[in-house]
Amino acid sequence: MKNLMNGACLALLMSGTAALANEQRAGRDRQAPQWAIQMGDYANTRYSTLDQINKDNVKDLRVAWTFSTGVLRGHEGSPLVIGDVMYVHTPFPNRVFALDLNDNGKILWRYEPQQDPNVIAVMSCDTVYRGLSYADGMILLGQADTTVVALDATSGEVKWSTKIGDPGIGETLTATVVPVKDKVLVGISGGEYGVRGRMTALNLTDGSEAWKAWSTGPDEELLVDPETTTHLGKPIGADSSLNSWEGDQWQIGGGTIWGWFSYDPDLNLVYYGTGNPSTWNPSQRPGDNKWSMTIMARDADTGMAKWFYQMTPHDEWDYDGVNEMILTNQTVDGQERKLLTHFDRNGLAYTMDRETGELLVAEKYDPVVNWTTGVDMDPNSETYGRPAVVAEYSTAQNGEDENTTGVCPAALGTKDQQPAAFSPKTNLFYVPTNHVCMDYEPFRVAYTAGQPYVGATLSMYPAPNSHGGMGNFIAWHNTTGEIKWSVPEQFSVWSGALATAGDVVFYGTLEGYLKPVDAQTGEELYKFKTPSGIIGNVMTYEHGGKQYVGILSGVGGWAGIGLAAGLTNPNDGLGAVGGYASLSQYTELGGQLTVFELPG
């Protein structure tokens, strides 16, 4: 397979940036090198054309300034920079700060929502929020209690607010909301409470509901056409979801949407993934449990589905499919294709044609993945696109109240929501990963609204017979399905990556280090330990002719839930407390933004 088409890739990246950086999106200066969207662009590449900081001088980085958020617990996502203002968010209670970059980060305004603290009890993997969005002079925030708020970017005044869920039954909001054209796309969290997943599109002008697409249930609620919506090129047929569940289990069947969304303006398609089916005990939900664990492509205006691909039918290990979809234009076997690349929790990296939903590549991006021997890639096979499950590691085949040991990866996946980056200069994807395995014992559980609906006991540990650590940072070829290089880390890499035109890739570690590495080789070029563990995403911007790099630190998330919530039982945090127990020897709770610069 041939290398990527650099020009085509850059054209896609710039089209996404232009769509955001006009008067209706990223406003004040069309050419300003801002950070106007959480993922850098609609294609989710997390790539910046800034190159003032490069592989030759990054060793000279120093701290330019810091800002305390005043909130502990896990800080995911990143700030936004629009013109001369930086917008910073926090985990619950979801504060928002507007900082003046022309005046030493002076607080221009702050927003402090009043939320019922009882919502904390139903946030299964810490009180995180993955970041703000910007559109039409408004800062868009999704609060933990499922309220979407539009704030005037200049004053902080509430323009409108809309509540899209019910925390009383376990529904929360942790994913960033994404403005696309005249809509705001909003997911929902709560799969561990039997929440039925859905995507809601609100009208940008007033927050009213435009459309809603469920992950499970009747065709009319899925927003599918049984004859034209396809799965691997074939029509899904009538009642595709209902036929894959026993009875009414689909009504509490999960498939929640709490990851990242991408958008192709040429195809007018939105891409995202759905989460695990509920419960975690597979014996209680026979069937493929459609459309959980699925990549979805939908029309941005209507929500109608063009195609689906279910990666892990009848999920037995909590391998949510919510991770980001990265969009690139590439040449494959001599033909230019519009591609989508997805690094799933299940340990497989998928490359697909994002226009048709054709599956092109499905390979393990950590060699220790053992629950499957691989995906059937024969389009003429009855099992085309399905992973072949290894019986030894099948929690369904081993049954209830049986402890299935040595499953790789653990439930938190080879990668969770921490986003990868893509560089059109190297044609590589840079992926923060978890190198963790687990023991998994399912048990029968009854559904009660607002109570945990898990049904499994887990323990986690570093992948055996390896380097002894719990993470790697890798460079990946998406058209060949190969790792170019891998950097071992003591703990999972729970930070989002950033690639730049300076031939540098940045990421953070759970101990709290910001690390830039050489994009070609993975060689570490510098490191600085911030006050707390990093689960935020690295971002960069230019202000006053100077490039800066920013990162939120504040340990937490699933991997750091023991520290964040003060838990000590090894089985708590769905097994993460025991697996990451030694993290407390390296960091503590915090909540700080650290901004770096070069001298001069």
Swiss-Prot record:
List of catalytic residues: 318 (proton acceptor)
Cofactor(s) the protein requires to work: pyrroloquinoline quinone; Ca(2+)
InterPro entries: PQQ_b-propeller_rpt, PQQ_MeOH/EtOH_DH, PQQ_rpt_dom, Quinoprotein_ADH-like_sf, Quinoprotein_DH_CS
Keyword vocabulary terms for this entry: Calcium, Metal-binding, Oxidoreductase, PQQ, Signal
Family annotation (CDD domains): PQQ_MDH
Binding locations of Ca(2+): 192, 276
GO CC terms, sorted: membrane; outer membrane-bounded periplasmic space
An example Gene Ontology molecular-function term: calcium ion binding
Family statement drawn from the similarity comment of this UniProt entry: Belongs to the bacterial PQQ dehydrogenase family.
Protein name: Putative dehydrogenase XoxF
